[in-house]
């Protein structure tokens, strides 16, 4: 008999296999959250969605909130990084505002049905979504102020900046809520929403030169009646 006895049963997981299981749990959490929000999120639903045993779940997470926080981390990072990247270009005025708006819409497009519970809980202090929203907004505010300072433009007042960001949030919520469950908003709705967002952002964060320039762009503002 050898000095060591061979281990019985299945071989230990590799690091790659462990990461795959962990990712599977996080993905399942996102899918359950999309249907139920945080109020209906439970370990039982997550393991059913992931097709794993309860002991497997607890090998990676202590409760249903832990994988949800990873979902929210990824969501925040996607929005903040998307806006940060959009504002790194040497753009001015109108183009800068449009890039900010397109970053919001690109972020929303990647969330699908998750947008409904995400936006429904944005202003609920009891939901972890609310705290994540505030952290994301703080980072976005700092990014916008830094860009305005870099361009030598007056820094927007806190109220103007929040008005612009909250309108972007609200419009994205409206178009996501109008879509059928499990589907994306139709392109016409998104295009109309984009124009609404551009108008509001220009009015709150722009100056007279920006508005005059935007007046010449097709489709941004309706022509005055003749």
Across the structure, where does each feature detected by a protein language model lie?
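Amphipathic alpha-helical segments used for helix-helix packing
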Residues: 108-127, 145, 173-181
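Hydrophobic alpha-helical connector segments
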Residues: 70, 84-110, 161-164, 191-194
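Amphipathic alpha-helical packing segments from all-alpha helical-bundle domains
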Residues: 77-80, 107, 127-152, 158-166, ...
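Alpha-helical DNA-contacting segments of helix-turn-helix folds
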Residues: 24, 33, 61, 67-75, ...
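Amphipathic alpha-helical linker/stalk segments
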Residues: 35, 71-99, 115, 144-150
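Short hydrophobic/aromatic patch on the recognition helix
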Residues: 51-61
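C-terminal peripheral helix-coil segments that are non-catalytic and often amphipathic
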Residues: 1-9, 106, 142-149, 174-226
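Basic, helix-initiating cap at the start of DNA-binding domains
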Residues: 1-36, 40-49, 66
